[in-house]
Structure formats: C-alpha cells, structure tokens
Amino acid sequence: MITRYTRPEMGDIWSPESRFECLLEVELAVAKAQAKLKIIPEKAYRDLKAKAKFSVARIDEIEKTTKHDVIAFVSNVAENVGPSGRYLHYGMTSSDVLDTALSVQIVKASVELFSRFDRLETILEKLVKKHSFTLSAGRTHGMHAEVTTFGYKLAGHLLEFRRTRGRVERAIDQMKIVKLSGAVGTYSTQPPEIEALVGQTLGLKPEGIATQVIPRDRHAEMLWALGMVGAAIERLSVELRHLQRTEVGEVIENFTPGQKGSSAMPHKKNPISAENLTGLSRLLRANAGAALENVALWHERDISHSSVERVIFPDSFILADYAIERMARVLEGLFVDETRMRKNIDLSQGQLFSSQVLLAMIDKGLSREEAYKIVQRVCHDLEPGDSLESRLIADPEASRYVDKSDLKKIFTGEKQKKRIDSVLGKLVRGPAKGRAKGHGKSEGRSAVRGKS
C-alpha cells in the first residue's frame, strides 16, 4: 500500500523485513520441536537459534537466480549458520512456512487493528452521550421523515462497529493456524507432533486436513471481515457527507489553519476525509472479492492465489487500520451544529410529528384511513410560515379529535427522547444518570415546542 494511506505501526508489520522475520520465527520454532523429538541434533537447533539471520538485499540477490523467494530466504539463512544450516527447513515445503508465517503476521496485525477499534469506539461513545438528546431530522428516501437525535443516529453506527469488530475477531481466530503437513498435507516428511508443538510455541492451532496449503476459505473469511470494516466505515462516511452539504450543514469536518479546499474557489470547505474513506472502502470490498476467487485451487494446490495474496493481505490490513484511524480523527474533530439541526427540523413545519398525530386521532376513535386522510390533507395544505400544530388547532375537522393539550405533548419531542434514552441506556451508555441538559430554542418560530 502507498505510504499516503499507511500508518507506520501497521506498515512495519507488512514490510519485507517483517515478513522474513515471521518466516524465521516459524523455521526456528520447527527446529526447536524437531530437536525436542530428536529428529535433528540438539546442537543443530542451538546453532540455528544463535546464528540464524537474513538480509533482504541478499535474499533478493539469490532470488534473481532461484526465481523462488523461500528458497532464497532459506539459502541466505543457511549460509549464515554454517554446517548446521542444512537442518533449516528440514522436512518442510515452502507453503508450510509461508502459510504459518502469514498466520503469525495476521496475529501481530490484529493487535494494531484492535487498538484502532478501541479508539474509534471510545470517540463514538462520547459523541453518543453528548448528543443523546440533540434533536435532528430523521430522513428516509433523502426526505424528512420523523424526529430522531444525532446521538441515536451515531449509536447505530457504534453498534455496527462493535458487530464488525466481532466479525474481525472471529475471522482472525480462524486464521490462527499452523500448517506443517508437507507437500500434499499427508505428513510424509515429518510427524503431526511437530505441528502440535510449533502451534503451542506460536499460539496457533493445527489445520485439521490441509493440502499443500491451508484451505483458502479461511483467508476469504478474513478478507470478507475486513471488507465489512470498509462497509461500516462507508455507511458512516456517506451519512457525514450528506449532513455536510451546503443545504443541510448539520456537521462540519475539522478545517485546520492553512488548509485549502480548492485551487480555484477560496471559499470551499469540502468533506474530504469522508469522501476519502468512501473510496478506500471500495478497495477493501474489492479485495474481499479477490480472496473469494482464491478458494478454488487446483487439486492439492496451485500458486494462482499467491500473487493475489501478496497484495490483498498487506493492503487490506493497512487500509482497514488507516480507515478506522482516519474516521476516529474525523469524529474527534467534528463540529455538530445543533442550531442548524433545529432549523432543518423547522423546514418541515412540524410534519415530522405527523405519525404521532395520526395515532392520537386513532386513539380518539377514528379509523386509521379516516385519520390518515385528515392529517395528510392538513400537511399538504400548509403554507409558508404555517406549522402543522397551529393548522391542526385551526382545522374544524382535525380539532374535533386532537386538542391543544394533545398536540403540546406531541410537538415537544419528549416521547422520542424518553424512548431513545431508554434504548441508549440499555444498548450503549449503560444506566442513564439523569436527564441531559436541554438545548435552547432556535431563532424564529420553531415547529418543535419547548426545549429539546
């Protein structure tokens, strides 16, 4: 992955140096197990442990001749060890070390990835608590629907990220696999006990039945889980992009001193981070598709998967890590315009409460069809400057079924806030500690009564 979208901490894990370190870690764990079972001399293991080292430049040099990177790696390490080097890679095939080393890399990468999840969830939790009662327009089909709160909206994303994290955790658990069963998975060159011992050393589980490789359904699940990270990131990114449109203006990404939005238009403040994350999410999903293509290999293995995985595993982990961190920064610096949210609610002149008026009329004895017809008529007859509440009071037919006291209860939004408080308390925040502070009235006449 290009450095622009790489956090150094994650990039280091997927560097060539780190990859070969993981290969060497596997090779030494195998030699240790073989020495324990007296398959190789104890002195050979001690020599390997003391002298094994590699040079990426030397490996690249050898590979120009061998056209095989694992052989080049083994040759380089062996030449540094001396006579005992002949016991390096003893009884192994290349995929034994490659697949097991990839498992080791993924476990290391997961530590960084989950630290980013922790940070993102913490920031989201703070925003949910802060804006639990910040009323905003809920939209369906891009149109005003009913009142919600900004905190409630974000709480849905928080829970989605928690589910996504769970998917990643389960996928990583499925990738904690050691495979040392040889060229076609039959343990022809060393016993299964070696695999078990190495698994204990590395914290991995033996594959039940392998071919030359670990079955690629595991890898596909891993990349699918990272693709779901992209999907969760994109859903929130798209929401933030819509809310930042000039006509909406409910949130604004942080704009730092000296930052510029356009080479031609000095006034521009664009949602560049949310747009960037939308694009990166496409790559994560695309890589998941490529991983699915790798599942069906020929017989006991071909190498059609290899070139793909050299790209998609580093790229997907690096991108997911970067995307989570960038989203955390977006939310950390996000300006939430509560006044604009209130004004946007007022654009609908109180119609966001029409469903509650409908139910109030039904409770007074009207059929649903009759009540719907009355409320729809009053809504569609609203003129500029009107509010649904005032027109219902003035309408002879509607006022027979809902009076001022009924409407006052509806148009404060208190019912939504109480129920939202209950839901957030159970799912997100833990037990509620009193009511959140109210927000002041917006300028001019508001379609929402009282404080919110």
Task: Locate the predicted segments by residue.
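Conserved hydrophobic residue
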Residues: 40, 248-249, 367
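Glycine-rich cofactor/substrate-binding loops
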Residues: 1-22, 46, 62-66, 83, ...
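A helix-coil-helix interface module used to build multimeric assemblies
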Residues: 1-181, 186-187, 191-197, 206, ...
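Alpha-helical support elements that line or immediately flank enzyme active sites
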Residues: 32, 105-117, 226-235, 240, ...
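Short, well-ordered beta-strand elements within core beta-sheets of diverse protein domains
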Residues: 152, 220-228, 356-364
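Amphipathic alpha-helices that form helix-helix packing interfaces
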Residues: 30-33, 113, 117-120, 124-127, ...
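Active-site-adjacent "gating/activation" loops or surface patches in catalytic cores
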Residues: 195-212, 216
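Glycine-rich anion/phosphate-binding loop at the beta-strand->alpha-helix junction
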Residues: 164, 212-305, 310
